[in-house]
Amino acid sequence: MSSDPQAVSGKSAALAGRTLVVTRPQEQADSLCRRIEVAGGHTIRFPVLAIAPAPDTAQLEAIVPRLDEFDLAFFVSPNAIHHALDFVLARRSWPAGLRVATVGKGSERVLLQRGFLEPIVPQDGFDSESVLALPEFAAAAIRGRKVLIFRGDGGRDLIRDTLRERGAQVEYVTCYRRYCPQLDPAILLQPAARGELDALLLTSSEGVRNLALILGGEGLRALHDVPVFASHARIAVQARDAGFAKVIETPAGDDGLLQALTKYFG
C-alpha cells in the first residue's frame, strides 16, 4: 500500500496543470488517465503497444479439451486472461481442479472479476522473479506438475525455463499478439516543441522500443529532456539506453506511478 494517501486517491495538487503522456495499450489506459485527470493533470494517450487476438487459434483450439490434464494455469497479463478465458469459456467450463496464477494487481483484479476467488499472485513483486519465489512454484511443490502458460507472442521465457528445471512439465498457449501501432509522431512532437510535455510514462520494455520506432531518431532526440517514469528496472535501463536524460524508476501499477509523480512534481 502506498505511504502517500494523496497519491493513491488522486487528490494531490502536485499534478495540476501537468501534461503526462500515457503509453499503455488503449484498452488498459483508462484507469490511469482518469486518476491523473482527477488530480488535475492532462493526459495525452499515445499507445505505443497494440493488442489483438492471436491470428492463429490452433493452440487455443487444441488446449480446450486438454485443460483437465493440467494442475496450474498461469496468465502473464490481463490481456492473456481476457483472450484465453473468452475463447475457452465460450466452449467449455473451467475445470474445477485447475488452479490459476498470475502476476500484478491488475491481473489479479481481472481474475477476481472473472470469478476465480483464490488466484495465486505474488504480493511483493510484479515480475517473473517474484512469481518464481512463491512457495507454489518452489521445486518441491511444482516437480511433476503440469503447468499451462497463457501468453502473447514473444516475451520472456524465464518462468517456463525455471519451472522445467524444477521438474515441471510446461506448455505455452499464445492467445494474443502485440504489435507496434501506426501513430502520428506530431501528437508528441508538437507539444514537446512548445515545452508542454511534463512526463512520459513507460510501462513496458517493448513500449520503449516501439516509441523509438514510431518517433524515429530525430523525433526521439526531441524528447530526451522530458522526464520518463519507468515502472520497472528493466524499463528504466532501456529508457536510459534510448537516450532519455531523466529516468525515474517507480513501483509497478497505478499506485506506484501516481506516488512517484506526486513526489516528483510536489
Give the location of each predicted region.
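Conserved beta-alpha
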Residues: 1-266
